[in-house]
UniProtKB/Swiss-Prot annotation:
Record family assignment: Belongs to the COLQ family.
Top-level taxon of the source organism: Eukaryota
GO molecular function, a single term: heparin binding
Effect listed in the UniProt record for changing D342E: In CMS5; impairs anchoring to the basal lamina
Gene: COLQ
Signal sequence bounds: 1-22
Protein name, entry field: Acetylcholinesterase collagenic tail peptide
Tissue: Found at the end plate of skeletal muscle.
Post-translational modification: The triple-helical tail is stabilized by disulfide bonds at each end.
Record organism: Homo sapiens
PANTHER family: ACETYLCHOLINESTERASE COLLAGENIC TAIL PEPTIDE, COLLAGEN ALPHA
Disease: Myasthenic syndrome, congenital, 5: A form of congenital myasthenic syndrome, a group of disorders characterized by failure of neuromuscular transmission, including pre-synaptic, synaptic, and post-synaptic disorders that are not of autoimmune origin. Clinical features are easy fatigability and muscle weakness affecting the axial and limb muscles (with hypotonia in early-onset forms), the ocular muscles (leading to ptosis and ophthalmoplegia), and the facial and bulbar musculature (affecting sucking and swallowing, and leading to dysphonia).
Biased composition, class Pro residues, residue ranges: 101-112, 134-152, 262-271
Ranges for region PRAD: 51-67
Chain spans, region Heparan sulfate proteoglycan binding: 130-133, 235-238
Length: 455
């Protein structure tokens, strides 16, 4: 079956309609209008103008569809046939006489819509329209809350035994069990070969403090280190107890012989004649005499064994000679005098310790005065311990001799004081807010105990 295009079908319908209208016999049999309208032959005879007044064919019942693309090549032969028929139908028509006007023809189809005119004014509010049709069903709603659980149903029958599952993972480690009984002691193994010496291990952690051991022998004196900072003066200590009296020293040398006494009074006259006999031998030496070491002995002076200043005054039994500070500290004799060879000075022992007797000597006794001007020339010569070429008494060389504690000159950077040389320090500057006089210890440290604060 041949399927025709809608446009081609419309054209065929028009041609079919025209062919039917052109047959007068068919029209008369269907619509008897011969009385009302003259036939085509009558119009041809009536005048030559009748042919020219033929009405155009009616418009098609179905308007052709609108095609945006080009025309189909199938329509070209039909259109050519239509044009040929129209030319053949109009070519023999001769202009005839004007006939009577015919009846009005049927109303044609509505024309194409015109252009949209300008927007008119807003009309009155119309009546409310009818109720529209129900819309499409809406989207299903969200599920509601879970309802209460229903009653528990009857228990079902036991199902068939399932297949054995895979082995599970290893469980956690259990708790440690109780220790077992101690086994029997094994036999002693053979002694193995001596292994190679291992590397030295790291030093271990310090152990616990052990008990204090016995005091070992005194070592050799070490090198003098740097002097530390001066500490704050401590509080005055309590008065110590008086020590035991020392051992009686050896007796002194016998003193010089005394002056001969005055001659006694003459004896009674002898009964007979006095004859001078020969001189006798020299007698044995007498005991050593007593030395009071004081003023001339008389009846007002005390006898030997008593102090010149009374029985309560202390006495100095003997003078010791030491080489250095260590030997001086070993002497425990109370109220004694010692001579230090290294410093060439005397020290006295009382309740406070060993104190120098010569506080501010200009120079030791064996210091020789420079008579030739050789000391201070910077050249070390016989008899000089040092020669720094200056006259500064605050360094380690004073008048060509080494400085030491007790020479009366403060060695800067080494000694806090020396004798009465405090380096321009007083109680006011050493302890602000105090007053009094500073003291210098036998070790050339400042003693601020005499300083007092205002109350």
């Amino acid at each position: 079956m041949v399927v025709l295009n809608p446009m081609t079908l419309g054209i065929y319908l028009q041609l079919f309609f025209l062919s039917i209208v052109s047959q007068p016999t068919f029209i008369n049999s269907v619509l008897p209008i011969s009385a009302a309208l003259p036939s085509l032959d009558q119009k041809k005879r009536g005048g030559h103008k009748a042919c020219c007044l033929l009405t155009p064919p009616p418009p098609p019942l179905f308007p052709p569809p609108f095609f945006r693309g080009g025309r189909s090549p199938l329509l070209s032969p039909d259109m050519k046939n239509l044009m040929l028929e129209l030319e053949t139908s109009q070519s023999p028509c001769m202009q005839g006489s004007l006939g009577s006007p015919g009846p009005p023809g049927p109303q044609g189809p509505p024309g194409l819509p015109g252009k949209t005119g300008p927007k008119g004014e807003k009309g009155e509010l119309g009546r409310p329209g009818r109720k529209g049709r129900p819309g499409p069903p809406g989207v299903p709603g969200m599920p509601g809350p879970i309802g209460w659980p229903g009653p528990e149903g009857p228990r079902g029958e036991k199902g068939d035994l399932g297949m054995m599952g895979l082995p599970g993972s290893r469980g956690p480690m259990g708790s440690k069990g109780y220790p077992g009984s101690r086994g029997e002691k094994g036999s002693r193994g053979e002694k193995g070969d001596l292994g190679p010496k291992g590397e030295k291990g790291f030093p271990g952690f310090p152990g616990m403090l052990g008990q204090k051991g016995e005091m070992g022998p005194k070592g050799e004196p070490g090198i003098a280190g740097h002097r530390g900072p001066t500490g704050r003066p401590g509080k005055r200590g309590k008065q110590g107890q008086k020590g035991d009296s020392g051992v009686m020293g050896p007796p002194g040398k016998p003193g010089p012989s005394g002056q001969p006494g005055r001659p006694g009074p003459p004896g009674p006259p002898p009964a007979g004649q006095l004859i001078m006999g020969p001189k006798g031998e020299r007698g044995f030496p007498g005991p050593p005499g007593r030395c009071l070491c004081g003023p001339t002995m008389n009846v007002n002076n005390p006898s030997y064994g008593e102090s010149v200043y009374g029985p309560s005054s202390p006495r100095v039994p003997v003078i010791f000679v030491v080489n250095n500070q260590e030997e001086l500290e070993r002497l425990n004799t109370q109220n004694a005098i010692a001579f230090r060879r290294d410093q060439r000075s005397l020290y006295f022992k009382d309740s406070l310790g060993w104190l120098p007797i010569q506080l501010t000597p200009f120079y030791p006794v064996d210091y020789t005065a420079d008579q030739h001007g050789t000391c201070g020339d910077g050249l070390l010569q016989p008899g000089e311990e040092c020669d720094d070429g200056n006259s500064d008494v605050g360094d380690d060389c004073i008048r060509c001799h080494r400085a030491y504690c007790g020479d009366g000159h403060r060695h800067e950077g080494v000694e806090d004081c020396d004798g009465s040389d405090f380096g321009y320090l007083t109680c006011e500057t050493y302890l602000p807010g105090s007053y009094g006089d500073l003291q210098c210890t036998q070790y050339c440290y400042i003693d601020s105990t005499p300083c007092r604060y205002f109350t």
